Amino acid sequence: MSKSIGIDLGTTYSCVGHFSNNRVEIIANDQGNRTTPSYVAFTDTERLIGDAAKNQVAMNPHNTIFDAKRLIGRKFDDPEVQSDMKHWPFKVISKDGKPVLQVEYKGETKTFTPEEISSMVLMKMRETAEAYLGGKVTDAVVTVPAYFNDSQRQATKDAGLIAGLNVLRIINEPTAAAIAYGLDRSNQGESNVLIFDLGGGTFDVSLLTIEEGIFEVKATAGDTHLGGEDFDSRLVNHFIQEFKRKNKKDITGNARAVRRLRTACERAKRTLSSSAQASIEIDSLFEGIDFYTSITRARFEELCADLFRKTMEPVERVLRDSKVDKASVNEIVLVGGSTRIPRVQKLVSDFFNGKEPCKSINPDEAVAYGAAVQAAVLTGDTSEKTQDLLLLDVAPLSMGIETAGGVMTPLIKRNTTIPTKKSEIFSTYSDNQPGVLIQVFEGERARTKDCNLLGKFELSGIPPAPRGVPQIEVTFDVDANGILNVSALEKGTGKTQKITITNDKGRLSKEEIDRMVAEAEKYKAEDEAESGRIQAKNHLESYAYSLRNSLDDPNLKDKVDASDKETVDKAVKETIEWLDSNTTAAKDEFEAKQKELESVANPIMAKIYQAGGAPGGMPGAAPGAAPGAAPGAAPGGDNGPEVEEVD
């Protein structure tokens, strides 16, 4: 059976899991962390993804990209994109009405779409899984906020394609979390479960009924632009004002200072979840001024009060839409790191008249856990836990067409279970009208100008007839990913026209995706070449230094001819000088230099060994050996130290 994974592609952190032997493994990355920052950085020499990218963000704020999820599937002039751009240190420009990210990479100006940046994070998650599972992994379920619209879902699916994944299904984050909660509780009769998912950048609430392995979403609501980052921003603005008051200086123009402050604010926010006060200490924040201050939990709650209160609106809406009263909610499950904030927990508990939320699931890992289970189901896993699992999700937004006068006429109402298909008959608006323009919208407002245009197409060649006579059957078909296909049929002539909404101008074309896939492979190869180059450089450097140290070893001093020592010393000195002035040399240059040094040193070191006095663990004579590995240990010696490579 092929190995499948579930990926929670988050705004700020991502997580990957794999289901086998009736359980889910959440897979740690190469740094040992079970979540990976959704960051990609570009430098003069390399591309960094995950922890390495986030760790250098203060030094390289303009070329370190994060929050791609707040851009994906949106238009450049989206008000939320415009407001986010004000506090991002990286550059977002418009290309064909879509936002693209502009960075300096290897000395050139490059642009990347949000899909490409997300694909790099997905590729990192895929590689994390491959390293652990020991083999190639392509099948994946990727999660999105329940409230993501059609274009955001499609763009996320494209990101998966660019990362070389076969995206089995796009599933909603709260639904995935519900699987994590309900998988072991499937035999407890029917229960109503409310998932409250407040992450780094998005917020969802879903109400599900869980019974014997069937997870049925009754309603969903949310805000695709509310999360932990918004709380950080409130703290950042608060401290920028405080710094201004104390020092009469404004740091907003200095990207590095603002970034260091944001990192400190994120840390303080986490501290405030367990302590009543947090201190902020940043040395030389701006123009040599140290910034030492503190904040109380009460003040933090006051700064974010309106945002916290805002989380209750979708809860009310979900209960209203699903016609369930709050007393009938059996369990409340908190998901997403931001639900650790005590004030948020209290608001939820108070809303449900003091009912305590479930504490048994990990808020950072639940979504990836559920996605991994669903991936196993979709690749044919039949273990006892998954064999009866059935997910019934819903469309988060109503979808319909524009009719005369700019009216939104929904064919599929929000919270309809998907997959679903719905047809309606429409007609012409004026006599002898030769064609109709079918414009597809999503949203809850009565006028299409207040809704989101998904796409449009023309059905032409209608025979002349009085208005209202031709019969045009419009069919909406939403698949299990929540992605829409629309077709129109003119009954008189049998003419049809169809559109997968995603062929709209906002979507990447097949050619663009193919190009991005090829580029992704190229970048990956470049990354691997760069790490090979660094490795060769480090090998040479540590070989040179360990040679020098060996010759200075008191036990060896009297066994080395002065002239031999001088020869090796000179070669080592030349090598180190060459290294200092050729840090960007190619891998084979470093390897050639190592061979050159070995050809001088090996005969001399061999002479010392034959004299029988070498301690274990001398610099190896074998070309390419790890520095410090002895070529056959000295008589009576041990095999030398185990050497660990330090990058």
From Swiss-Prot:
Residues annotated with N-acetylserine modification: 2
Region called Disordered, residue ranges: 611-647
UniProt cross-references to CDD domains, sorted A to Z: ASKHA_NBD_HSP70_HSPA1
Signal peptide (from-to): none
Entry keyword set: Acetylation, ATP-binding, Cytoplasm, Nucleotide-binding, Phosphoprotein, Stress response
Record localization: Cytoplasm
One BP annotation, GO: protein refolding
GO cellular component: cytoplasm; cytosol; nucleolar peripheral inclusion body; nucleus; plasma membrane; post-mRNA release spliceosomal complex; protein aggregate center
Biased composition (Low complexity): 620-633
Phosphoserine PTM sites in chain numbering: 546
Cited Pfam families: HSP70
Modified residues (Phosphothreonine): 36, 339, 417
GO MF assignments: ATP binding; ATP hydrolysis activity; ATP-dependent protein folding chaperone; heat shock protein binding; protein folding chaperone; unfolded protein binding
Main location: cytoplasm
UniProt family annotation: Belongs to the heat shock protein 70 family.
Protein name, UniProt field: Probable heat shock protein ssa2
Gene (name only): ssa2
